[in-house]
Amino acid sequence: GLVFYRYSGAQWDMLGMMFFNRELIVETWPILLGGLENTLLIFICSAVLSVTIAPIIAIIRTLNNPIFNCAIDAFVDVFRSLPILVLVIFIYYALPFLEINSTPFAAGVCGLFLSALAFMIEYFRAGIESVSRGHVEAARSLGLGVIQTMRFVILPLAIRVVLPPLTGHLVGLLKATA
């Protein structure tokens, strides 16, 4: 440490002035708050969209329809394997060739939404499939319909399984917006 301090060529006496300069902080504070606002808006938009649409697609995925399953599997495989940055750049620069113009904000939200949606579909599908058949059969024997069984029995039990990975992914999504 001392060798680095002595021979690095850094101006260590300027360190305090560079990092704790009140005038510099006052100048850059509005810029930082604007970036924080954009980060939170992109995160909230993409998180709300993906958390509301993922359970619906996961329920469709568990219906065992071969056409839907093939389409959903292809979507999940493609968008889980693409890096978020590549996806956002592709949306922003490739869609104008299809005469679909978007703002950088919309491209960011769309890219993060598609990436998060692919992961969250799998989280919700795994949560739904983790509910034991005994619970489903008990609900059906009590006279609950398919939709009522899904709403009152399967989804509340699946949320317990889904919540930890979903929370972790939302934290990662917030970090990815920056």
Regions found by a protein language model. Name each.
Residues G1-A178:
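Transmembrane alpha-helices and adjacent helix-loop boundaries
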